[in-house]
């Protein structure tokens, strides 16, 4: 499908979903549900936006099967999916939106590539990028302007390294990895020993950083190498901007770390963990699989059971909810205590009179 306009029926066939409505409706773009016009396809994933369904002018709306049962009587063109509507909408983006190319195909003459480096086929290396000795860049990789691939480091096939990324020496980047601008992978960890004279002496860090397949790393995120063991981000994990991952940390498979979170050294994060924005996790602990940490959670000890945690120190969400409810009741409790104190004073006065 290479054209830019599709009928509702064509899209349903391409997306492998059912549709309700006029199959001949022509669609030529994508838009949010509030802004969509008759030529646009949109989606409903979060029920908070269901209030826009009735007034939406969208030519077609992707919804889940459950949502369709609720809203089928609105007389709209619906594409009905058993998957997340957002995921199906993403496939539409790939149809309608043409990626912006950097305009620098192949290897730019200003790129600096060491004679011992191995560059596979179909690689794009933009202006002023540097590939150091014995580095290996896999096939169909893209290395952005001003990025550095350190000595003895590897970048797996179909990975996309955006401009001004620093991948230090002896770092392993897997296949289909995306690293956003300004990220630094493989810096020395923040490890020091204090001498008898109170001076802080930096410790050499000999470990590597290993980034497995299908990982995404946000802008200005830093992942430090371990002192002896490796720092590892397992397959499929997604890391937001401005995240700090310290030395010898292991992040499990398909986990998500939101902006400004920090993980101290030698901590092990399980699989399918979600770490909220500005959360802080101390070092040398373990986080179980399927843990969700709310924003600004402060984790001071290991979490051994799946669940939702928040607060500082971290505790189960239900406990926080109960505590918040009690805090809300404090003004009323204060009034009741004041009334009781007055009553006690009256009783004491009566007692003294008798």
Swiss-Prot record:
Residues that coordinate or bind hexadecanoate: 240, 244
PANTHER family: UDP-3-O-ACYLGLUCOSAMINE N-ACYLTRANSFERASE, UDP-3-O-ACYLGLUCOSAMINE N-ACYLTRANSFERASE 1, MITOCHONDRIAL-RELATED
Residues noted as binding UDP-N-acetyl-alpha-D-glucosamine in the record, renumbered to the chain: 190-192, 248, 266, 284
Stretches assigned to coiled coil: none
Name of the protein: UDP-3-O-acylglucosamine N-acyltransferase
Pathway: Bacterial outer membrane biogenesis; LPS lipid A biosynthesis
Keyword presence, Acyltransferase: yes
GO molecular function, one term: N-acyltransferase activity
Function recorded in the entry: Catalyzes the N-acylation of UDP-3-O-myristoylglucosamine using 3-hydroxyarachidoyl-ACP as the acyl donor. Is involved in the biosynthesis of lipid A, a phosphorylated glycolipid that anchors the lipopolysaccharide to the outer membrane of the cell.
Any one Gene Ontology cellular component term annotated for this protein: membrane
Active site: 247 (proton acceptor)
Superkingdom assignment: Bacteria
Chemical reaction(s) catalysed: a UDP-3-O-[(3R)-3-hydroxyacyl]-alpha-D-glucosamine + a (3R)-hydroxyacyl-[ACP] = a UDP-2-N,3-O-bis[(3R)-3-hydroxyacyl]-alpha-D-glucosamine + holo-[ACP] + H(+)
Assembly: Homotrimer.
Alphabetically ordered keywords of this record: Acyltransferase, Lipid A biosynthesis, Lipid biosynthesis, Lipid metabolism, Repeat, Transferase
EC number: 2.3.1.191
Organism classification: Bacteria, Pseudomonadati, Chlamydiota, Chlamydiia, Chlamydiales
């Amino acid at each position: 499908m290479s054209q830019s306009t599709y009928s509702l029926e064509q899209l349903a066939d391409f997306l492998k979903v059912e549709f309700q409505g006029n199959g001949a409706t022509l669609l030529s773009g994508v838009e949010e549900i509030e802004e969509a016009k008759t030529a646009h396809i949109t989606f409903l994933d979060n029920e908070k936006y269901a209030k826009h369904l009735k007034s939406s002018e969208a030519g077609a709306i992707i919804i889940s099967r459950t949502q369709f049962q609720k809203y089928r009587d609105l007389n709209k063109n619906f594409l009905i999916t058993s998957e997340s509507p957002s995921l199906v909408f993403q496939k539409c983006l790939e149809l309608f939106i043409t990626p912006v190319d950097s305009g620098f195909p192949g290897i730019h003459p200003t790129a600096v590539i060491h004679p011992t480096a191995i560059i596979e086929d179909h690689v794009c290396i933009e202006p002023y990028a540097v590939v150091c000795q014995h580095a290996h860049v896999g096939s169909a990789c893209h290395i952005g302007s001003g990025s550095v691939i350190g000595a003895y480091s590897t970048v797996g096939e179909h990975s996309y390294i955006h401009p001004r990324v620093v991948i230090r020496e002896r770092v392993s980047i897997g296949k289909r990895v995306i690293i956003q601008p300004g990220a630094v992978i493989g810096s020395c960890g923040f490890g020091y020993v204090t001498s008898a004279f109170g001076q802080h002496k930096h410790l050499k860090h000999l470990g590597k950083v290993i980034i497995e397949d299908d990982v995404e790393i946000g802008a200005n995120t830093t992942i430090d190498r371990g002192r002896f063991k490796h720092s590892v981000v397992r397959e499929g994990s997604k890391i937001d901007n401005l995240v700090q991952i310290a030395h010898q940390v292991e992040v499990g498979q398909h986990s998500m770390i939101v902006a400004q979170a920090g993980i101290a050294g030698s901590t092990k994060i399980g699989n399918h963990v979600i770490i909220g924005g500005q959360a802080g996790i101390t070092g040398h602990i373990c986080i179980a699989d399927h843990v969700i940490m709310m924003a600004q959670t402060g984790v001071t000890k290991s979490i051994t059971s799946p669940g939702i945690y928040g607060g500082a120190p971290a505790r189960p969400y239900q406990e926080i909810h109960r505590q918040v409810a009690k805090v809300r009741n404090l003004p009323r409790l204060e009034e009741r205590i004041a009334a009781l104190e007055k009553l006690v004073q009256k009783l004491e006065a009566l007692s003294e009179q008798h």
